[in-house]
Structure formats: C-alpha cells, structure tokens
Amino acid sequence: MHNRKRKTVKKTVSFSDDQNLTNANLNNHRKGHIDDDTPPVYVRKSWTLIPFHLLALLYWFLKYTDFNLLALLYIMIPTQVIYLIFRFNKNTIYGKKRLRLNWLLVFITLGACLLLSIPCLAIIVLFGAPFVELLKESWLLALHCCFLTYPAVYDVFNCNFKVGYFKKYFISVVIGCWISCFVIPLDWDRDWQAWPVPLIVGAYLGSFIGFSIGGYI
C-alpha cells in the first residue's frame, strides 16, 4: 500500500472576534499594504479656497498705506483667522471625516506663528537680509511670512503633525519671496523697491497661488 502524504494546512491564530476583520487584514497583507500609501489628510479641490482677501490687502497696501508693513500685518492676521474658520478648515479632510474647529488651537497657532518668526528671521538674515540697520523691517517680513502660512500651521497641529502634505503652502511663500528679490537691485529709485516691500508682495502672491491650487497638487 502506498502511503499517501497528508496535506499540511496552514493555521492562523487571531485574537479578534470579528472573522471578517481578520480576513481583511490578511488580504491587506497579501496586497502589500497598499492602503497605507494613501494620504490620511488632504484639502478638497474647491474654488472657495482661493484667498481673495490677500489680493485685496495687497492692493490696499500698495495703493493707500505708503507701504506701512505694520498696518498690513494688523489687518492680515484677523483675515487669515477668518479664512481658516470659514474656508480652509471646512475643506480639510482627515481620514474620512471633516475636522471640527478647535478654538483653543486657533489661539495657540497664533502664538506658534509668532514664535516661528524668530527662526524665520534667522534664515532671512542668513540669506543676506540686513540685520543691524533694518532689523525691524526684516522681522516684519518674517512675521508676514509666518502668518501667511497660519492656516497650514493650524492644520499641521490639528492633523497629528502631517507636515509632508502641508509643506507646499510654506514652499509657495518662500518661492514668492525668492522670485521678488530681483527688483531690489534695479536702478529705478522707486519707493516700493525699499527693503522688504518687494519680498512682502512676493510672499502674498506666493501664498495666494499656494492656497488656490494647493488642493490640486
């Protein structure tokens, strides 16, 4: 008589009461955890995210304020908070749900942006900004850059520090500043060429573009 070889049966041990959940976990393991690659946080594609208020502020700054950086900052900060509450937060999805507004975090993020202006100032100075004679102007530039990214900073805190997704909003401000630098050395002798007015304009335009198309990138 021929000895028949018994087929070995692979046994799995599960501590879950839900057999369907166990099967789903096995399927995910076989697929190589494809679901892990999907981003847990994203911003919806919507025209309501276009920050028209930044263009309005920029027009007012260039037309009527005699390039008053402090006055522009005082108005920009509350408008950014309003933009976060009624636009950016409502279009931010974390996992499969829309995030509720965390009022405490709204105010904490304001303080965080203020603190972030210090390392931002250091970076600006390292890239050649005047430090001694125009320190106030350089710090105002750092403050504008940090508060322009205020909605993104809030979502970084509110979404478990998912910096990777929101870094594009910071990069857009940096690129705007960098591109606008070319007008400063031009021999035009215009008031708007004074430090750091061109970089402020570039930062606002970069932020406008970044928040407008951020959901599509």
From Swiss-Prot:
Glycosylated residues (UniProt): 20
Keywords, comma-separated and alphabetical: Endoplasmic reticulum, Glycoprotein, GPI-anchor biosynthesis, Membrane, Transmembrane, Transmembrane helix
Ranges annotated as spanning the membrane: 41-61, 66-86, 107-127, 139-159, 169-189, 197-217
Gene this chain is encoded by: GPI11
UniProt subcellular location: Endoplasmic reticulum membrane
InterPro entries: GPI_biosynthesis_protein_Pig-F
A single GO cellular-component term on record: endoplasmic reticulum membrane
Topology in the lipid bilayer: Multi-pass membrane protein
Recorded family membership: Belongs to the PIGF family.
GO biological process: GPI anchor biosynthetic process
Name this protein carries in UniProt: Glycosylphosphatidylinositol anchor biosynthesis protein 11
Pathway: Glycolipid biosynthesis; glycosylphosphatidylinositol-anchor biosynthesis
Pfam families, alphabetized: PIG-F
Role description: Acts in the GPI biosynthetic pathway between GlcNAc-PI synthesis and GPI transfer to protein.
Native organism: Kluyveromyces lactis (strain ATCC 8585 / CBS 2359 / DSM 70799 / NBRC 1267 / NRRL Y-1140 / WM37) (Yeast)
